[in-house]
Swiss-Prot record:
Pfam families listed in its UniProt record: Glycos_transf_4, MraY_sig1
GO cellular component: plasma membrane
Pathway the protein contributes to: Cell wall biogenesis; peptidoglycan biosynthesis
Record bears the keyword Transferase: yes
Membrane-traversing stretches: 3-23, 51-71, 79-99, 115-135, 140-160, 172-192, 197-217, 223-243, 248-268, 306-326
Catalyzed chemical reaction(s): UDP-N-acetyl-alpha-D-muramoyl-L-alanyl-gamma-D-glutamyl-L-lysyl-D-alanyl-D-alanine + di-trans,octa-cis-undecaprenyl phosphate = Mur2Ac(oyl-L-Ala-gamma-D-Glu-L-Lys-D-Ala-D-Ala)-di-trans,octa-cis-undecaprenyl diphosphate + UMP
Protein source organism: Streptococcus gordonii (strain Challis / ATCC 35105 / BCRC 15272 / CH1 / DL1 / V288)
Family note: Belongs to the glycosyltransferase 4 family. MraY subfamily.
Record membrane topology: Multi-pass membrane protein
Record protein name field: Phospho-N-acetylmuramoyl-pentapeptide-transferase
């Protein structure tokens, strides 16, 4: 446990040192920064804010986790597998951000390119996971289900789905970073109960990095994590649930990401079926609350108010999950 705490503190320090340096690099290089294409007026002031901050906490977490796990004798196949997915999905996000920021390609990677790279990363993760005894048993609400060769399709769906879900959640200052901290906190408890001290190192390391990043990402944000951060974090959560053989728990622990994704899917489907009508003022659904509270027609909510609502939902859902598992 103390090794995991050291990993968290190390990544926290590396992040709070690295982020200011990264911001200065942005400013000196006169990089355009984040572009805003949303219809939320209060977001227009954020145009030009440095992005790709996820690069800092991601690299800090990967390096700190690897080195500390290595020297503490905890560099297991589980650790390398999680670090592997962090790197692969972070790389996909980095390419997407790089095209947007440095090449001025507004779309970045197109959806097909991004999906292809995510699927490739998922296949590599599956092969690595299976090679090290991962198995093909799916935990469905506490009941084991043998999937056989179909397990790879579940893994791909889980990794791609949740990486994109966290990406959708990263739409207002601080929302994704603390939401993921809460989710990782729940998985830290599960890992501790399973005596998976190797995974605790990676979990605590990322928590430390995100807490350090939040100091610069809360409203008003000085930097955004970008796709490099959000895609990697979503992939990590999915990979953790698989490595801990508690896949179903991510539906509750990650309820915020599920809610955000479902809102987009419902909005698009309803819009097409009704010829232009909407369920929400704007999706992902955190923008609906920004524009007009619960009803979408009331007084606009501040980002802090939306943040605390969603963090609260995530925290309660995580506590319920842990209660189901251990009480």
């Amino acid at each position: 446990m103390h090794t995991a705490i050291i990993a968290g503190i190390t990544t926290f320090i590396l992040t709070i040192i690295g982020i200011p340096a990264f911001i200065r690099f942005y400013q000196k290089a006169r990089i355009s920064g984040q572009q805003m294409h949303e219809d939320v007026k209060q977001h227009q002031a954020k145009a030009g804010t440095p992005t790709m901050g996820g690069t800092v906490f991601l690299l800090a977490s990967i390096v700190a986790s690897f080195v500390i796990a290595l020297f503490s004798g905890n560099l297991s196949s589980n650790v390398t597998t999680i670090l592997f997915i962090l790197f692969l999905y972070g790389l996909v996000g980095f390419l997407d951000d790089f095209l947007k920021v440095f090449r001025r390609i507004n779309e970045g990677l197109n959806p097909k390119q991004k999906l292809f790279l995510q699927l490739v990363g998922g296949v590599v993760f599956y092969l690595f996971f299976e090679r090290h005894g991962g198995g093909d048993m799916l935990n469905v609400f506490g009941f084991p289900l043998e999937l056989g060769f179909l397990y790879i399709f579940f893994v791909l769906f889980w990794l791609v789905g949740f990486s994109n879900a966290v990406n959708l959640t990263d739409g207002i200052d601080g929302l994704a970073s603390i939401s993921v901290v809460i989710s990782l906190g729940a998985y830290a408890v599960i890992a501790l109960e399973q005596k998976r001290f190797d995974l605790l190192i990676v979990i605590f390391s990322m928590i430390g990095g995100l807490l350090g990043f939040f100091g610069f990402n809360h409203k008003p944000a000085k930097i955004f994590m970008g796709d490099v951060g959000s895609l990697a974090l979503g992939g990590m959560l999915a990979a953790l649930s698989i490595a801990l053989h508690q896949e179903w728990t991510l539906l509750l622990i990650g309820i915020v990401y599920v809610f955000e994704t479902a809102s987009v899917m419902l909005q698009v489907t309803y819009f097409k079926m009704t010829g232009g009508k909407r369920i929400f003022r704007m999706t992902p659904v955190h923008h609906h609350f920004e524009l007009g509270g619960f009803s979408g027609r009331g007084k606009a909510w501040s980002e802090w108010k939306v943040d605390f609502l969603f963090w609260g939902i995530g925290l309660v859902a995580s506590l319920i999950t842990l209660a189901i598992l251990y009480l």
